[in-house]
């Protein structure tokens, strides 16, 4: 369906309300959104309560502010169905600076959505937002003496590396999972954490949204890591935890489309991390502290670190295609990227065991390789490392295999025959010693990264 026609037909989107139901076992939050003239949507979240927590939400303006804010990021999944030009926020109150903050998140967080749907928009006119609600009444129940870490677990190598770096703090660590699945649960287990140390929340999508997507309404990527940030703040507050420890690396800052600001990983970027940190400190004030443990590192360094974490090698999963079946599909850009980035540090035989496919010998992946290494203007719309890092990993693997007297796999043979090895070799020292100073790590965590990753 045409973007302009949809905006003309469905001119208003309303964030109507949120409802909080609390029992001894959980807190359930139900949101109500409406595309005027098309449909209402009522997605919900469930946050588990540990025994003895007592009443949390009742008459707690801080908790309501967190819930309202999660709704603000949740709404974009429903707004994008028609991209209504007017958004009316009736569920709470926002000032002009907050409205500008949310619009910036939506605009950049939907960069891939606009690009893949062929939509050209400008930040100053893609949406008008008006605040029509009131701030919550009740006490602003700030918790003192928050301590410990909560690590969001995605099931891939990055959160496994964060857990391994925080091994000595294990007694005060918790793992945070949205909608548990095989790889996330296995990561928690392999890290040596039991059920008591896992905070598993449930997020639902309204079925009506899926129906409308199937009917041809607009669909595409939304800033999921922003959902993680706002929901994790609620979970950390409920469990008296100070630090929300993400696993986003420096390479997440690179744009997906060369020469543009379109970034599949925008809400994993340092810009979003800083922006969220400022927003939370200014408007929510939960007392939690959100930062990425791996921000100083490149994907290359993370892969080197992960290669030493053998307890996770058979259970980690990053493949979106195979995520529902908890497998590596062995044919997508994400699988090929992870295969390449680990190839200097693990043998080809071991990688073939892990992925169930010898991907470097699969010539049908040649076009995907070209995207990953920068021979195409766009990187795949996946969470993958920078083009230079992937080239460096391939060069190191070629060096390793030739030193061992082994025949090069087909993709690496092509790479070398095209002169790419000569063009890109010799950069590894830069990535082995790379340290991005743009990060928010508290000193004690920065010290851990420096001690364990720069030897």
What does each of the following model-derived ranges do?
Residues 158:
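Hydrophobic/small residue at the entry helix of a nucleotide-binding pocket
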Residues 204-211, 215-230:
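Catalytic cores of extracellular degradative/oxidative enzymes
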Residues 1-148, 165-178, 182-206, 217, ...:
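RNA-binding accessory domains that recognize and position tRNA/RNA substrates
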Residues 77-89, 236-244, 342-353, 399-406:
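Short helix-capping/linker segments at secondary-structure and domain boundaries
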Residues 152-155, 176-180, 201, 222-225, ...:
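Short His-Asn-centered micro-motif
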Residues 228-309, 322-328, 341-349:
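Active-site adenylate/phosphate-handling loop in enzymes that bind or generate adenylated species
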Residues 163-164, 185-190, 209-216, 255-260, ...:
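Short acidic, glycine/serine/threonine-rich loops at helix termini
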Residues 2-31, 292-293, 307-455:
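ATP/NTP-dependent adenylation/nucleotidyl-transfer catalytic domains that generate, transfer
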């Amino acid at each position: 369906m045409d973007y302009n026609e949809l905006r003309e037909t469905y001119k208003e989107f309303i964030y109507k309300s949120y409802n909080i139901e609390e029992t001894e076992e959980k807190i359930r939050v139900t949101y109500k959104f409406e595309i005027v003239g098309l449909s209402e949507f009522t997605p919900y979240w469930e946050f588990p309560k540990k025994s003895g927590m007592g009443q949390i939400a009742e008459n707690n303006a801080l908790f309501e502010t967190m819930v309202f804010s999660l709704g603000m990021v949740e709404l974009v999944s429903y707004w994008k169905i028609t991209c209504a030009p007017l958004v009316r926020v009736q569920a709470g109150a926002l000032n002009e600076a907050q409205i500008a903050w949310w619009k910036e998140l939506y605009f950049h967080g939907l960069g891939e959505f606009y690009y893949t749907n062929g939509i050209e928009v400008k930040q100053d006119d893609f949406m008008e937002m008006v605040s029509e609600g009131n701030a919550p009444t009740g006490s602003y129940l700030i918790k003192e003496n928050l301590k410990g870490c909560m690590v969001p677990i995605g099931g891939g190598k990055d959160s496994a590396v964060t857990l391994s770096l925080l091994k000595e703090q294990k007694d005060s660590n918790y793992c945070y999972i949205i909608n548990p699945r095989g790889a996330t649960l296995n990561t928690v287990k392999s890290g040596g954490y039991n059920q008591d140390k896992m905070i598993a929340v449930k997020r639902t999508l309204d079925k009506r949204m899926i129906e409308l997507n199937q009917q041809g309404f607009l669909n595409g990527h939304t800033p999921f890591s922003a959902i993680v940030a706002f929901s994790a703040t609620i979970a950390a507050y409920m469990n008296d935890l100070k630090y929300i420890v993400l696993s986003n690396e420096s390479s997440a800052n690179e744009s997906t489309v060369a020469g543009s600001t379109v970034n599949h990983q925008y809400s994993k970027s340092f810009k979003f991390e800083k922006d969220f940190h400022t927003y939370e400190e200014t408007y929510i004030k939960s007392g939690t502290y959100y930062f990425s443990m791996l921000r100083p590192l490149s994907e290359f360094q993370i892969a080197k670190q992960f290669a030493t974490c053998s307890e996770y090698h058979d259970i980690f999963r990053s493949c979106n295609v195979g995520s529902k079946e908890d497998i590596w599909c062995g044919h997508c850009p994400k699988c090929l990227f992870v295969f390449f980035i680990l190839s200097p540090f693990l043998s080809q035989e071991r990688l073939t065991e892990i992925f169930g496919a010898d991907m470097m010998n699969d010539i049908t992946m040649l076009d995907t390789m070209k995207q990953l290494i920068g021979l195409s203007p766009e990187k795949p719309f996946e969470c993958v490392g920078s083009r230079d890092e992937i080239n460096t990993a391939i060069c190191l693997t070629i060096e390793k295999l030739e030193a061992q007297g082994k025949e090069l796999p087909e993709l690496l043979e092509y790479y070398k025959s095209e002169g790419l090895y000569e063009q890109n070799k010799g950069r590894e020292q830069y990535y082995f010693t790379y340290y991005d100073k743009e990060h928010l790590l508290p000193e004690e965590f920065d010290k851990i990264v420096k001690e364990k990753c720069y030897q």
